[in-house]
């Protein structure tokens, strides 16, 4: 089975070793055809507390790490600009 990966933006880093990543999904509306943007928020494990708010990151699905955390940060694609 393929490993699920998502790319998103860190929206919260207030927890220890955990960040919240917002992932946008763009798809056309089935009836009207307009592109609809849906945002899903995932809690991801950040072992070294490297990711900061605004960073673009790639997350990878993993075993359950807590009640709501099933993703881990694979890499930081682009750090936020000051």
UniProtKB/Swiss-Prot annotation:
<keyword id="KW-0687">Ribonucleoprotein</keyword>
<dbReference type="InterPro" id="IPR019979">
    <property type="entry name" value="Ribosomal_uS17_CS"/>
</dbReference>
<keyword id="KW-0694">RNA-binding</keyword>
<dbReference type="InterPro" id="IPR019984">
    <property type="entry name" value="Ribosomal_uS17_bact/chlr"/>
</dbReference>
<comment type="function">
    <text>One of the primary rRNA binding proteins, it binds specifically to the 5'-end of 16S ribosomal RNA.</text>
</comment>
<dbReference type="InterPro" id="IPR012340">
    <property type="entry name" value="NA-bd_OB-fold"/>
</dbReference>
<keyword id="KW-0689">Ribosomal protein</keyword>
<keyword id="KW-0699">rRNA-binding</keyword>
<protein>
    <recommendedName>
        <fullName>Small ribosomal subunit protein uS17</fullName>
    </recommendedName>
</protein>
<dbReference type="GO" id="GO:0022627">
    <property type="term" value="C:cytosolic small ribosomal subunit"/>
</dbReference>
<comment type="subunit">
    <text>Part of the 30S ribosomal subunit.</text>
</comment>
<dbReference type="GO" id="GO:0006412">
    <property type="term" value="P:translation"/>
</dbReference>
<dbReference type="Pfam" id="PF00366">
    <property type="entry name" value="Ribosomal_S17"/>
</dbReference>
<comment type="similarity">
    <text>Belongs to the universal ribosomal protein uS17 family.</text>
</comment>
<dbReference type="InterPro" id="IPR000266">
    <property type="entry name" value="Ribosomal_uS17"/>
</dbReference>
<dbReference type="GO" id="GO:0019843">
    <property type="term" value="F:rRNA binding"/>
</dbReference>
<dbReference type="GO" id="GO:0003735">
    <property type="term" value="F:structural constituent of ribosome"/>
</dbReference>
């Amino acid at each position: 089975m393929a490993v699920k990966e998502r790319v998103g933006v860190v929206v919260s880093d207030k927890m220890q070793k955990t960040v919240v990543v917002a992932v946008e999904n763009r798809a056309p509306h089935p009836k009207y055809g307009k592109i609809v943007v849906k945002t899903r928020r995932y809690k991801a494990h950040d072992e070294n507390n490297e990711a900061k708010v605004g960073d673009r990151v790639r997350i990878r699905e993993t075993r359950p790490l807590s009640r709501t955390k099933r993703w881990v940060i694979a890499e930081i694609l682009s750090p936020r600009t000051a």
